[in-house]
Amino acid sequence: MSLSHVAPSHDAYGQAKRRKVRKGTHSCWECKRRKMKCRFDPRIASACNGCRRRGSPCISQEFPEDLEEAVMNIGTTSSDGTPFDGRTRATTPSERTDQILTPVSTVREPSQYPRSPEQHLPTGNDTSQRKYERLSRFLHELLPSRADRESIFKASRHSSILSHELLTTPYITLHQNGLQTPESLLMTPQPNSHPVLIARYMLQFALFLQHLPPDLYKEIQGLSEPPRATMERLADAAIYHVTTNEALINSIESLECIMLESLYQVNLGNLRRSWVAGRRAMSLAQFMGFHRPDNQTRYYKALDPKTNYDPQIMWLRIIILDRQLCLLLGLPEGCTDHTMASSETRIANNCPMGRLEQLHCVAMSRILDRNASQPSGRDLTATRAIDLELQKAAGSLPSKWWLAPKLDSASTDLQAMFWDTRRLVLQICHYNLLNQLHLPYMLRPSTAGNKYEYSRITCVNASREVLSRYNSLRSFNRIAYSCRTVDFLALMAAMALLLAHMDSYRDGAENLLANQYLSDRGMIEQVQEHMSEINRLNSDELSAQSADLLKSLLAIDLEKGKGRVSVREAGSEGMLPQDGMGPEEESVVRVHIPYFGIIRIAREKQHATTASKPPVDRSPSSNSDAQLRFSTLTHPSNALPLSPNTTSNPLSFAVADAAAPHEFTTPFAHQQQQPCQPTFSNPGLSLTPSPLMQGGYPDLAAGSEDWAFQRVDMAFFESIMRNVGGDL
């Protein structure tokens, strides 16, 4: 059993005296150090969610902190009595060829699955046929019992089907043959099967458990361990022992395993780990020759003759997921292959959803290429060209295909429900691409007519389409690990739509969005409610933080406030000398984003414009308008104090007169944070770093429990602020 799942025993604590703690203190030592909310899953009450994810001991503050070492020593001997270090260390792939118990070097966490005893380790004297026999037996012993599998399948027979075939099989084939049902997982690999085949089964089973509805947990009785614990144990073992072991990565099934790992991580919300796994899959696929247009040169083998795979589909899936994650995380794409949409015949032979995905794949590459270049006047031309490509892609499908499908939880046709859900998610992805494409121009002021009005309206409409479909999806599907990327897309769409409404209150400008404000606000409130409910049902950190962020932004009531929104560089010609400081600041809204800092929105009196700018005609009613400054933060690349020369990119927009500073100055309610103190103040600039910034970024491979937004928030604001330096 995992050490992190074992409550500290009386033997571990001995006669240690309990400490006196402040009333209301419930967090463990590890969560206190990380300044994270200590949450317990009622289904797994032996350790908090954060410690379970990290694989660290969950020690209550009632006990001395130095007892953690005693707990770490529990179970640090193998079954044959051989002691081994319970803490992990970085290892090389060659070391893990001889020692299968070593965790992957890129994830420095204690192992969350039983370690194999020394007698299971392969030796150099083994023949090629028996080289991995001991590893196979060890992995096979980790599989859930048949009784557990039957109990789970019986409870889920009317609620889910398997989707992992999407990674290797064309849509047309799946439509014809149908997707597999959970009962197909009753047949496990043999104990002497190749480790890769057993690992593939383990990852497939873990993905199936990710899609279990949370209300089924109460119906499944008599299991040896909770389904979520089984999911984590199987996936961790497969990843540590197989998918990250270079000696085992030489077959089509091993590539499939890495793709399953990437999908598993993205479902958890671990976008960064998923991206790393996806890059490993891309490299292996290139070794196998998948990137060749004709794919006639084969550099791979199949371990099981029954394995169904299509190299072109697998290559397409790898590239699509890589580009989706790159857009979310603000990273460069892994390859610039556009061949999936270069042939009209190749596109025409696909089904409608397949054609759209191929065209989306190329559009994502062009957006990433634009974002990777320095901002210039050519950006707008490239943006319009990509927009036309997306219009053409949408036009390749029938008009009725774009109607949002109705998802009925009472339906018994699981195959039809799966494809309707897939269609809805693909529609959301299309509108998200429009958002990503035009976001850098959404808040741009134009000195040449309505140069950027098209981008602004496109972002608004695309955000509405994303949010309406998200509400439809989450009314039907409350599983946190299902359709995970849609949660990130909905959060970005909600923030974009709110900022667009703030931008609509420009001085002297006609508000084209005024009539839609209340309905848009109601839709975002519904999104926030769905995220709160998903967190309640699943104890999901991403949903909790997203709901808190939207709640803070929704506290800004634009019905009462008027002003203007502008995007300017600090120190630029349009910068107001007294913008944001002094006693004239009447109210403040502070929104905390972990590892990003404080977004500070201050309602202030309007100041006169600079002499170099022509005066703006104002009506008498606008003379007392308030201006809000939205201060973004420098990235927490280090813990050094901000220098007086630090610059920022403020946004200005309106907030309600009734807003009081004390109403919004606290960080997320579910996080334990210390009060934030400004480290730098200067006329026209306000920076308030987060306490979490003082230690820099979290680990690069930090999971969603420690870094819920995974840098998606930073990429979003970077995109908004892309072209602030002048009118391009």
Swiss-Prot record:
Disordered: annotated span: 75-130, 606-626
Start-end of Polar residues biased regions: 89-109
One Pfam family in the UniProt entry: Zn_clus
Highest taxon of the lineage: Eukaryota
GO biological process: DNA-templated transcription; positive regulation of metabolic process
Feature: DNA-binding region: 28-58
InterPro entries assigned to the protein according to its UniProt record, in alphabetical order: Transcription_factor_dom_fun, Zn2-C6_fun-type_DNA-bd_sf, Zn2Cys6_DnaBD
Name of the protein described by the UniProt record: Dehydrocurvularin biosynthesis regulator
Name of the gene encoding the protein in the UniProt record: curR
